[in-house]
């Protein structure tokens, strides 16, 4: 996760203290985030086709699937290190600090897949393996962000204490999946299928950010700025699916 901000407060005369010159500043930084795994139940629908090779127990086919996953992984109280500086009254001052993100979330909401497969049939069943592309909707969420800077060793909420920002971005990304499974025919019309699938989205980058403002307090005047950030990575999804299928 990478994050930066730009600061543009105007000149200000506080109720307490001397007048202050305007400030122009910026900071940036980044960090790695280790997301925990998430387990949940989700619905799935699929349609497929298979056919035997001539005079053989071997078969080929393809399966199109839709999975409404709605799986979210969350890291709370994530710190994004920052370094930068500001200019006030012609004097430049360097500083470092952190952006505090109360919760950072990566979600995979839904996924389409199309997987050709090869299999081998038995008396009333067949087993198969396959692989193919996926198209997934993912979501990146950063909730309740506050930017802190260390001025002379004292942490200061640059974006305003209690003045948080939140961002959420959805996008569709390509990926790939592989599956292995088996189908058992209950009769000529119905079958039961059990399969394991693992998929991985492509490495994607999400841009997020926007303006923020703080009304000021008795010491400091109003501040405005812009958050600018990116998040990059991929999502691995593993599923075990049990389905009842109609044969036609």
Residue ranges of each PLM-predicted region?
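Acidic helix-start/capping segments at beta-turn-to-alpha-helix junctions
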Residues: 60-70
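Residues on the lipid-exposed face of transmembrane beta-strands in outer-membrane beta-barrel proteins
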Residues: 3, 45-51, 64-66, 110, ...
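Membrane-topology and secretion signals of cell-surface/extracellular proteins
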Residues: 54-59, 127-135, 144-150, 175-176, ...
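Extracellular/periplasm-exposed beta-strand and loop segments of Gram-negative cell-envelope proteins
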Residues: 5-40, 68-110, 136-173, 201-239
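Short loop/turn motifs that connect adjacent beta-strands in outer-membrane beta-barrel proteins
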Residues: 52-60, 123-124, 186-189
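Exposed beta-sheet edge/beta-hairpin loop segments within beta-rich domains
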Residues: 118-121, 170-172, 182-185, 233-234
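Mid-chain, structured segments of secreted extracytoplasmic proteins
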Residues: 39, 46-48, 58
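A structural feature that tracks compact, well-ordered secondary-structure segments
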Residues: 193-199, 203-209, 245-247
């Amino acid at each position: 996760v990478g994050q930066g901000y730009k600061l543009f407060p105007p000149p200000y005369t506080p109720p307490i203290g001397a007048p202050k010159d305007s400030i122009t500043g910026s900071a940036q930084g980044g960090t790695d985030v280790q997301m925990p795994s998430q387990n949940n139940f989700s619905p799935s629908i699929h349609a497929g086709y298979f056919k035997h090779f001539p005079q053989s127990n071997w078969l080929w086919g393809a399966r199109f699937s839709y999975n409404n996953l709605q799986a979210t992984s969350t890291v709370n109280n994530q710190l994004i290190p920052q370094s930068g500086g500001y200019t006030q009254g012609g004097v430049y001052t360097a500083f470092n600090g952190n952006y505090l993100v109360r919760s950072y979330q990566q979600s995979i909401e839904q996924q389409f897949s199309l997987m050709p497969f090869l299999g081998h049939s038995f008396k009333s069943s067949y087993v198969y393996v396959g692989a193919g592309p996926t198209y997934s909707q993912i979501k990146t969420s950063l909730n309740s962000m506050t930017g802190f800077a260390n001025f002379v060793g004292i942490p200061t909420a640059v974006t305003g204490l209690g003045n948080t920002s939140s961002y959420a971005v959805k996008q569709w990304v390509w990926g790939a999946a592989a599956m292995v499974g088996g189908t058992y025919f209950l009769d000529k019309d119905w079958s039961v299928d059990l399969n394991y699938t693992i998929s991985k989205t492509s490495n994607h980058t999400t841009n997020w950010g926007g303006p923020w403002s703080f009304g000021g307090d008795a010491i400091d005047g109003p501040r405005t700025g812009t958050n600018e950030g990116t998040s990059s990575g991929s999502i691995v999804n593993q599923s075990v699916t049990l389905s009842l299928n109609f044969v036609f």
